Every structure is written in structure tokens, then in C-alpha cells.
């Protein structure tokens, strides 16, 4: 009779013990890049008995020590181990492209993600904002998102999103807040799907697809470009979105 360990290894490609070690290190890499927690706190939080043993294991996996990984102005996503429940067999249309700078007009939102919730599904509030904005503006909508350490709380990630369009007025009213989409090299993905699938989309990109492609993320904002057609599209009586997702890469 096959054991649970055999089933697990067949699904994930590694033993349960190795998976747990890799997940701890991958989780710690995310905390290094997206929070202000100290290396010491991260090491003990991940169950290591010392900072030295944590640093040794981290360097074996990622090629640099935790401090240098954090300080780098890019994010090397290679060797991240996705959680077992994430569908890494999902395929999305992909290409590398160059974007030119573009001014858009809209509004800003911000919220926090507790580190205990990582990896986090996309917020259902965001889904609601997207559909309401598409309907209200009657235009394709951009969403520029950044994820950074919170200066006042090392247990959360600060998330900022700017929703905008290419025109600075709607129904005769001016939209006062401008923002510039920065030019540069991006990995471009196409997504069409319903709410549940969308909520896991960025996790799949970051934890599965980009590491497989050996792509390194540079500094900058993630850009989502939602098509107006999303408002009319339905799938099994569920609203779906049609979007292009751009991630800044080296």
C-alpha cells in the first residue's frame, strides 16, 4: 500500500520534510523583501535554532545571505517553493515586452496584509472596486499596485493601489489625481476568469511561473489593465475579468 509520503512526493516532487524546509525558506524570503522584520525575528519565527543556521540554509537555497537578499534592488524569484495547494499546472499567455511611459488619472487606495495571511488571495474588495470602476467610467481601467514594508508595523505589508484611466474626466467631472506608468521591460500575462481564479492568479505567477522561467523582478509597480468587456462577460452566471498583467523584470 502506498503511503501518504509517496502520494505527497508524487504531487510535489519532493519529500514532506524537504517541502517543509523549502516552504520555510521561501516564506522567509518573502518576509525579507516585503516586511521590516529583523533577520533574527524571521529566523526564529521560521523555527531555526540560530541566525547562523538560518543564514547557512538560506544561502544554500538562494545563493546569498539574508541581508544581501533583502538589500538587493531586485527580487530573484528562482528557487521559491510554492505551497502544495497552488495549481502550478495553470498556463497563461506570456511574453516579454517594453512599455512606454503613460499618464493616467484616477484614485488611490491602500490597505495592509498581515504576514500570517501569506500567501494572500487578492482582496474581494479589489474585485468589487474593479467592476464598479469599469461600470462607472465606461473605460478600460489600469490598476498599479506596490507591496512594501510598513514603517510602523513589522507584522504587516503595506499595499497601495492606484486605479486609473487614460482620460482625466468622466461624465463632465474632472479626475484630479494623475499618475505615470513607468516605461521599461515587463513580463506580460493574459488572464480571463472568475473571482476565485483571479484571487489566486498573482500567487500562481509569482510562486510558480516566474521561478520556472528564471525571471528576476526589478523594482516597480505591478500593472493590471482591465478590459471594459469584463463588465459584460459571464461564466456559469459568475462575473469574470479580462486583463493583461505586467510585472517589471530585468
Residue locations for each model-derived region?
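Generic hydrophobic, amphipathic alpha-helix propensity
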Residues: 20-25
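HTH DNA-binding helix-turn interface
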Residues: 1, 6-19, 48-49, 58-66
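A solvent-exposed interaction/effector surface
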Residues: 26, 30-33, 38, 44-250
Amino acid at each position: 500500500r502506498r503511503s501518504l509520503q509517496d502520494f505527497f512526493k508524487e504531487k510535489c516532487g519532493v519529500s514532506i520534510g524537504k517541502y517543509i524546509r523549502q516552504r520555510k525558506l521561501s516564506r522567509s524570503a518573502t518576509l525579507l523583501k516585503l516586511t521590516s522584520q529583523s533577520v533574527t525575528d524571521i529566523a526564529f519565527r521560521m523555527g531555526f535554532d540560530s541566525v547562523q543556521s538560518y543564514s547557512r540554509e538560506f544561502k544554500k537555497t538562494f545563493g546569498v545571505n539574508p541581508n544581501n537578499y533583502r538589500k538587493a534592488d531586485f527580487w530573484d524569484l528562482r528557487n521559491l517553493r510554492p505551497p502544495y495547494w497552488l495549481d502550478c499546472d495553470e498556463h497563461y499567455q506570456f511574453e516579454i515586452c517594453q512599455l512606454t511611459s503613460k499618464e493616467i488619472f484616477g484614485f488611490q487606495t491602500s490597505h495592509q496584509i498581515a504576514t500570517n495571511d501569506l500567501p494572500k488571495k487578492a482582496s474581494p474588495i479589489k474585485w468589487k472596486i474593479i467592476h464598479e470602476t469599469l461600470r462607472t467610467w465606461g473605460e478600460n481601467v489600469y490598476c498599479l499596485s506596490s507591496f512594501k514594508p510598513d514603517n510602523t508595523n513589522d507584522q504587516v505589508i503595506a499595499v497601495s493601489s492606484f486605479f486609473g484611466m487614460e482620460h482625466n474626466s468622466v461624465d463632465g467631472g474632472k479626475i484630479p489625481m494623475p499618475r505615470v506608468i513607468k516605461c521599461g521591460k515587463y513580463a506580460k500575462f493574459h488572464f480571463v476568469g472568475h473571482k476565485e481564479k483571479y484571487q489566486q492568479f498573482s500567487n500562481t505567477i509569482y510562486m510558480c511561473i516566474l521561478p520556472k522561467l528564471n525571471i528576476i523582478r526589478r523594482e516597480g509597480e505591478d500593472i493590471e489593465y482591465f478590459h471594459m468587456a469584463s463588465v459584460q462577460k459571464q461564466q456559469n452566471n459568475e462575473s469574470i475579468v479580462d486583463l493583461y498583467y505586467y510585472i517589471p523584470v530585468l
